[in-house]
């Protein structure tokens, strides 16, 4: 009888330990420290010369080269509603825009974008919004791209 109780306690403790380890490994993978950003994408180009020709008149842009493709971004935000607002602004200017979700993990950039999103929400004019996005893109260049 004592052996059965002893083995039952050992099995119970082993089950708790194994279950806890599995739970922690699953929650760690699910809840990473990366934040979701909405990138306002103008296009993807396979040729640098074609990309340069198409965006030469845009003063407000960031270009990321990934696997010999050139991604042109006109804005970055953490707020989906602001992303939709930016898309509307750029489409009214004649651009074909895509909203692309990307994950980044940089606390400084996260804090900056959060503050800029608050400014955009308080802004009423397109000019103000585009000026704020110019600063966001400069932040991306300075904080994220320099560390890649």
Model-flagged regions — what are they?
Residues 1-148:
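Acidic/polar low-complexity segments and flexible, solvent-exposed patches
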